[in-house]
Amino acid sequence: MKQNRKNLPIILASSSPARIELLNRIKIIPSQIIPADIDETPNLRELPAPLAIRLAYEKAIKIASQIEESAIIIAANTVAAVGRRILPKATTYEEVKNCIKMLSGRRHRIYTGLCIIKKENDQLTVRQKIVQTIVKFKKLSDEEINFYCSLDEGIDKAGGCKISGYAEAFISFISGSYSNVMGLPLFETVNALTSLGFRCSSIMPAKMNYCHSAT
C-alpha cells in the first residue's frame, strides 16, 4: 500500500509581513523565516524583470546553501518600474514623495520574481517565475501626495507605496495578480509548490484545515 509522504518544511527567505500574510491566506505556515541578506543593487542597464528574478534566485540559493536539512525554500523579490526605469525601495520621506509624484496619473508595472527551491538529500530542484501586474494611479493632487507621504507606509516599499494600504485608494486600474503587487503571486506559488510535490489539502475550497509544513 502506497503511503503518503509528509510535506517538507517550508522556509520563507523573507521577513516581509505581507508575504507571511499571503502564505497564511493559503493556509501555509512556514517552519522557519530566514531573511536572505543580499546586495539588491541593479546591474548596469539591468531591466526590471531580469532584476526581480535574479534577486529572487540569489535569495533562495543563499538560504539553500546555509541549511543542512531537507526543505522547500520560498523566495521572492518585487520591483516597481515606470517603463524601463526601476523605482527604488524608498527609505526616506523625499524618496517616497518622488516615487508617488512619478506614479501619479500613470501606469506602472510591478514585477515579482519567484524562486522556489526544493532541497532534498543535497539535491536541488528549482522553480522560477516572473509575474507582472500593471497598475494605474489616478492623477494625485499635491495635498494627496503630501498626506500619503505623511503616513510613512511607503517606507521600504518598492516604488514608495503600499498597495494594500492607503495607496489602494489611488488605483484607477489594475491588470494582473493583486497578490503579486503585495509581494507574492499566490497562483504561481501554489503551482510551483505542487510541481515540487508539496501537498496542502487546505488549498482546495472544501478543506479548511491549516497545512503546517513538517518540522
UniProtKB/Swiss-Prot annotation:
Return the Pfam families for the record.
Answer: Maf
Q: Tell me which InterPro entries the record gives.
A: ITPase-like_fam, Maf-like
Q: What biological-process GO terms show up in the record?
A: nucleotide metabolic process
Listed GO MF terms: nucleoside triphosphate diphosphatase activity
What enzyme category does the UniProt record give? hydrolase
Q: Where is the signal peptide?
A: none
Q: Which domain of life is it from?
A: Bacteria
Family under the similarity heading: Belongs to the Maf family.
Task: Please give the name of this protein.
Answer: Nucleoside triphosphate pyrophosphatase
